[in-house]
Amino acid sequence: MKQKLLVIGGPTAVGKTDLSIKLAKNLNGEIISADSMQIYKYMDIGSAKVTKDEMNGIKHYLIDAIEPDTPFSVADFKQLGEEALEKIICNGKFPIISGGTGLYINSLTCNMTFTEAEKDESYREYLETLALEKGNEYIHEMLKDVDPISYKEIHANNRKRVIRALEVFKLTNKPFSSYNVGLDFYNSEYDVYYYVLTMNREKLYDRINKRVDLMMEKGLLNECIRLKEMGYNSDIQSMQGIGYKEILYYLEGKITLEKAIDMIKQGSRNYAKRQLTWFRRDKRCIFLDKDIMSDDEILDKVINDIIKN
């Protein structure tokens, strides 16, 4: 019998953290955070990081796990996540994944193979230069002979993906498309229960706007100033996150603070929209509408689904 694994997904500000902690209390569980920003140390307010008080005694993994300037990929998350899952199960606890980064969730629940550990920076730079000089179509055509499947599946303008496909072939002598071919993508060693919280779009957007205002009240500006003083600037991946890059624009004198706040709100709303699009594409997701169901009804449904099966 497969080990059961619970996933709580959904857009930003929908209430995933609160639900996952209540579920962990009821199921004797521990939580893996699948959030691309909460994994970084010192980035607390802008990432709406769960606090020690909010954790309510529930152990969380992959929060404050790496320095802000540490290069971090989905493959890295998969490795850390698998180690966390093993610890949770060995501790006799129920594993719960909670977060809004769909790709991170998939890395632990789908049949995904990564070759991210293998990189050739000089070849990447060569291809980037080639694309700038001769156009995206030129490097896209290079794919035709070595990986015709990726050539058809990856659009010429998705330069990053085209470069990655060419790089994988150069490093492994195997086409990028050969990874996962013939395998059921959703095949997992776990019995996955995947729930996604939703609510009326206008209501969600209002929650997002209010949360950004609360972040400013809690000291997001000072958090960004402190990060900048620690040497973390816009040239690193983590500082390109929503809430950080906009405040950096303000600190660099490029925009007003009011404009930065508006941009954070707009960026967060756009991100929520993309998150929902991602989850709707996943055939495993069971959507729980918070406009129709109360928090207690959602809690009861998830617990009953897991217990009765």
Curated annotation (Swiss-Prot):
Coiled-coil stretches noted in the UniProt entry, renumbered to this chain: none
User: What catalytic reaction does the record list?
Assistant: adenosine(37) in tRNA + dimethylallyl diphosphate = N(6)-dimethylallyladenosine(37) in tRNA + diphosphate
> Could you tell me which residues belong to the region Interaction with substrate tRNA?
35-38
Q: Where is this site: Interaction with substrate tRNA?
A: T101, R124
Q: Which GO terms describe its molecular function?
A: ATP binding; tRNA dimethylallyltransferase activity
Keywords on this record? Answer: ATP-binding, Magnesium, Nucleotide-binding, Transferase, tRNA processing
Superkingdom as given in the UniProt entry: Bacteria
Q: What class of enzyme is it?
A: transferase
Task: List residues binding substrate.
Answer: T12, A13, V14, G15, K16, T17
| Residues binding ATP | G10, P11, T12, A13, V14, G15, K16, T17
Q: Name one GO biological process term.
A: tRNA modification
So what EC number does this one have? 2.5.1.75
InterPro entries xrefs: Dimethylallyltransferase (IPR039657), IPT (IPR018022), P-loop_NTPase (IPR027417)
Query: Cofactor(s) for this protein?
Result: Mg(2+)
Per its UniProt record, what PANTHER family does this chain match? TRNA DIMETHYLALLYLTRANSFERASE
Q: What does this protein do?
A: Catalyzes the transfer of a dimethylallyl group onto the adenine at position 37 in tRNAs that read codons beginning with uridine, leading to the formation of N6-(dimethylallyl)adenosine (i(6)A).
Give the family, as the similarity comment puts it.
Belongs to the IPP transferase family.
Subunit annotation: Monomer.
Task: Tell me the NCBIfam families matching this sequence.
Answer: miaA (TIGR00174)
Q: What is this protein called?
A: tRNA dimethylallyltransferase
